[in-house]
């Protein structure tokens, strides 16, 4: 299995704060996420600025699109994002629209369906049918705060998604100790936000994640 990528989530309240965090690890991470909080605070300009400063990195605009998919996706992609996100509760026509927009670019740009507990496996089949390539298995920030840990149900769902042919990203308070839980699954990306940003040595933490990946994926 290929090595997973490491993605930093920038859910900062300002672009200045996000750029300060990126200055420490931007060259080391594989993927840079302009998080929903940062997008709300700074708008699409945050995507433009980060894409300009890090042209060789994959950029995700975590818009959690729920409607008006064509407009949002074109806006984020034109600003420099390679990937965007659509929330799993979005209607199927919205999901189809975001895929269509991404397919109009060369090379193709992709939208990840961000999954919460509010989905059905019938929906998953429909996403596959309309051309979705990526999904994000998401343990919510509020669930983390309530002490909810990764469960067998989570792991089984992630494996099922990978078996269906999706490129699967895992997020939700990921720590170094969590990586081993997913060792038998071809994970595409692990997202770490506060685990990296709040570390005493963020660069070392990124390297530790990569070291963990090398233990379990070849």
UniProtKB/Swiss-Prot annotation:
Substrate binds at residues 11, 194. GO terms for molecular function: 3-dehydro-L-gulonate-6-phosphate decarboxylase activity; metal ion binding; orotidine-5'-phosphate decarboxylase activity. Keywords: Carbohydrate metabolism, Decarboxylase, Lyase, Magnesium, Metal-binding. The record marks 64, 67 as: Transition state stabilizer. Disulfide bonds: none annotated. Binds 1 Mg(2+) ion per subunit. It is an enzyme of class 4 (lyase). SMART domains: OMPdecase. Pathway: Cofactor degradation; L-ascorbate degradation; D-xylulose 5-phosphate from L-ascorbate: step 2/4. It catalyses: 3-dehydro-L-gulonate 6-phosphate + H(+) = L-xylulose 5-phosphate + CO2. Mg(2+) binds at residues 33, 62. NCBIfam families: PRK13306.1. Catalyzes the decarboxylation of 3-keto-L-gulonate-6-P into L-xylulose-5-P. Is involved in the anaerobic L-ascorbate utilization. This is Probable 3-keto-L-gulonate-6-phosphate decarboxylase. It comes from Mycoplasma pneumoniae (strain ATCC 29342 / M129 / Subtype 1) (Mycoplasmoides pneumoniae). The gene is ulaD.
């Amino acid at each position: 299995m290929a090595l997973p990528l490491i993605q930093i989530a920038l859910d900062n309240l300002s672009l200045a704060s996000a750029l300060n965090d990126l200055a420490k690890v931007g060259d080391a991470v594989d993927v840079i996420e302009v998080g929903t909080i940062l997008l709300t605070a700074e708008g699409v300009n945050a995507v433009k600025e980060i894409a300009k400063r890090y042209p060789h990195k994959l950029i995700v605009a975590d818009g959690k699109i729920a409607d008006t998919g064509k407009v949002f996706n074109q806006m984020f992609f034109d600003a420099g994002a390679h990937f965007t996100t659509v929330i799993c509760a979005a209607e199927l026509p919205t999901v189809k629209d975001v895929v269509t927009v991404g397919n109009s670019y060369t090379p193709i740009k992709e939208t990840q369906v961000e999954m919460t507990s509010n989905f059905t496996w019938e929906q998953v089949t429909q996403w596959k049918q309309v051309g979705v390539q990526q999904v994000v298995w998401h343990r919510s920030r509020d669930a983390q705060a309530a002490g909810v840990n990764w469960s067998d149900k989570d792991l089984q769902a992630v494996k099922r998604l990978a078996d269906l042919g999706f490129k699967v990203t895992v997020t939700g308070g990921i720590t170094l100790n969590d990586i081993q839980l997913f060792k038998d699954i071809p994970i595409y990306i692990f997202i770490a936000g506060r685990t990296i940003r709040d570390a005493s040595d963020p660069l070392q933490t990124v390297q530790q994640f990569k070291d963990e990946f090398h233990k379990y994926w070849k």
